[in-house]
Curated annotation (Swiss-Prot):
Keywords: Leucine-rich repeat, Repeat. The lineage of its organism: Eukaryota, Metazoa, Chordata, Craniata, Vertebrata. The keyword Repeat applies. The gene is LRRC28. SUPFAM superfamilies: L domain-like (SSF52058). It comes from Bos taurus. SMART domains: LRR_BAC (SM00364), LRR_TYP (SM00369). This is Leucine-rich repeat-containing protein 28.
Length: 367
């Protein structure tokens, strides 16, 4: 086996192969023959599926500087090492079905990366530096142990497909609603009890799958007329079991995002002072060409300054930004034309989040 491996690599070196297939070789270590002398300078794609690798060499980028695809599916790699950040031409990295516990921050240096697949590992978090991957189009981190996603993920301006199925997510950063290119979002099999208010506001986002999030009872009305999957959602549960603000209408109850501080009703004609102040500051912020210098560094807490950049959501009726209070209105899915797709048995509702009593009274999902 060793001699056959050496021969394969030697031929690739002599003939300046661009693709090298070392799948199913029972390799426990990265082949030294790949790293000898100047390495394989012409190699662009390396496939090493179903081996027993536990780590990657520190000089990988030095010996294989032109790699655009590295396929390491089904190995035993525990850590994505710092050296990975030096593969500046890498476009596709597949580390699915390994034993990954840590992804190093240096992964953010892979500025050419377009496809990152980390499914079926042991990851509990992603480094914020993932947000530096401006060319990233596909991110698959399904079947891990993630509790949340980094807020900076919304800086992945080219991201089109995000898959985080079968993790332990209990919330999704509202910042992800700002992803300008996101077309498909799949979060099935998590622990979500609510979704960001603005999810679905982007016209680019067309497919959202949240199946089997049993505590999830409300879908933002922006998702109406999108392709959605919500089977297994809205299971009966005592509201006291979930420590979140909830809103009820008739026999229906939905949980609201943790950032929501108050719920308005048709009787609340006057907005809270903090909400009025935040809306005024937000308008001034945009009127001053997004220059917050008119605010002194100590005039607002950091959390409120951050809210100015990324509001809680936008009114589903008039697009007015909202910061602390929302006026919700429920539309049971079973009473919409979409009921047939779910055999009319779902207890999930569409939720319109409005900014005032006027918008609350005039919003109509079906009009």
């Amino acid at each position: 086996m060793a001699s056959e491996l050496c021969k394969t690599i030697s031929v690739a070196r002599l003939e300046k192969h661009k693709n090298l297939f070392l799948n199913y070789r029972n390799l426990q270590h990265f082949p030294l023959e790949l790293l000898k002398d100047e390495g394989l300078q012409y190699l662009e794609r390396l496939y090493m599926k179903r081996n027993s690798l536990t780590t990657l060499p520190e000089n990988l980028a030095q010996k294989l500087p032109n790699l655009v695809e590295l396929y390491l599916h089904s190995n035993n790699i525990v850590v994505v090492p710092e050296a990975i950040g030096s593969l500046v031409k890498l476009q596709c990295l597949d580390l699915s079905d390994n034993a990954l516990e840590i992804v190093c921050p240096e992964i953010g240096r892979l500025r050419a990366l377009r496809h990152l697949r980390l499914a079926n590992n042991q990851l509990q978090f992603l480094p914020p530096e993932v947000g530096d991957l401006k060319e990233l189009q596909t991110l698959d981190i399904s079947t891990n142990r993630l509790l949340t996603l980094p807020e900076r993920l919304h800086l992945c301006l080219s991201l089109q497909y995000l898959t985080v199925d079968r993790n332990r997510l209990w919330c999704v950063p509202r910042h992800l609603c700002q992803l300008p290119s996101l077309n498909e979002l799949s979060m099935a099999g998590n622990r979500l009890a609510f979704l960001p208010l603005d999810l679905g506001r982007s016209r680019e986002l067309q497919y959202v799958y949240v199946d089997n999030n049993i505590h999830l009872k409300g879908l933002p009305s922006f998702l109406y007329n999108k392709v959605i999957g919500c089977s297994g959602c809205g299971a009966p549960i005592q509201v006291s079991e979930v420590k979140l603000l909830s809103f009820s209408s008739g026999q229906l109850t939905v949980f609201l995002p943790a950032e929501v501080k108050a719920i308005g009703t048709e009787k609340d004609h006057i907005l809270p002072l903090q909400e009025l102040a935040m809306r005024t500051l937000h308008h001034n912020y945009h009127a001053s060409l997004k220059d917050l210098d008119f605010l002194s560094p100590v005039s607002l807490p950091r959390s409120l300054l951050e809210l100015l950049h990324c509001p809680l959501g936008h009114c589903h009726r008039c697009s007015e930004p909202m910061f602390t209070i929302v006026y919700p209105k429920l539309f049971p899915l079973r009473e919409t034309p979409m009921a047939g797709l779910h055999q009319g048995r779902t207890t999930v509702s569409f939720v319109a989040y409005c900014c005032s009593t006027q918008c609350l009274q005039t919003f109509d999902l079906l009009s």
